[in-house]
Amino acid sequence: SAKLCVSAAMDEDETVIQYPFGFGLSYTAFEIASAITDVTENAITVEAVVKNTGDTAGKEVVAIYVEAPQGMLGKPSRVLAGFAKTQVIAPGEEEKVTIVIPKKAYASYDDSGVTGHKDSFLLEAGSYKIYAGADVRSAALAGSYEQELQVIEQLEEACAPSEQFERMTRDADGTLVYKKIPAREFGPYDRIEKPEEIAYTGDKGYKLADVYNKKITMDEFIAQLSDEQLIMLFHAEGMCSPKVTAGTACAFGGLTEELRALGIPATCTTDGPSGLRMDCGTKAFSLPNGTLIGCTFDLELAQKLYEMTGYELRRNRVDSLLGPGMNIHRNPLNGRNFEYISEDPLVTGKMAAAQIKGLGIVGSTGTIKHFATNNQ
């Protein structure tokens, strides 16, 4: 079965979402019975028994949603905190699924200091209800537990908005309200430390392979390079560079004879999240787009799919795939949503990690892209 990794369409009164997050059809039917089996300082464990009550073998998604107390920060009604996909379950058979959820997965961020812990991820005190099921609406209560105020991670302000605006949040009673965001206290460059300068030594005869073989350090290798060589090292050539595989997106690295003489190869990349784009007549496999992969909620399947893509990259002498796409579906009109996985950051992150892992298994890699601010 496949499930929506986005929510879509309101009813005529625009009060009820017709297709909630996690909604999907199957050729069979399932029952899910769940319970919280352990709560520790940093994680909770939920066990679910999934039974196939239909006539056809199939897989099912078990998603864990958390309803947190509104507290002073305001929370979504429910937030996805973890998920798993069963193996194929025969009719009448069942499978036990155990999901361990780090508490950080449903912590809230306090950017104003209203809790007394500014710039931290934390859990506000109160009762936390845990639900298990496929979609966010039909998921059944697995249990609840009482949580004391707990700071999960203390951070520092780095890049807060420069201008204040109002954002929608909830009061303690759940009422939707608009409140101004806190004013910036530090600029984005205030805390950036300048790196130590490496003294230029000139050509010492070192090759990049000497770093790999631990004969020299990377700093010693870099010290050989002039400013002009360093600039060229980070300069890229666009589509169809003659220095790499024909028809690919860009080349970078060893683009000059001097850099190649140091053992720095010209590195090749190509688009993208829907498979290799080769604008030269070379044929390649087209992949399901990011959103369709997200709808599977199947990390194992995503990893295996990208293992295959990794082999295809190597066959075409491409070093890095320009993907997966990491932007989330903030706006349904975003022109490149097909490249992105979900409106949910957890699904997006886990699916993208599975894809990168699949590429890496066969010695390829990917470039996670459009992490934010690419709403075209």
Regions found by a protein language model. Give the residues of each.
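Glycoside hydrolase catalytic-domain context in secreted enzymes
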Residues: S1-S138, L155-Q376
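Extracellular and select intracellular beta-sandwich modules with Ser/Thr-enriched
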Residues: A139-G143
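Short beta-strand edge segments in extracellular beta-sheet folds
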Residues: S144-Q154
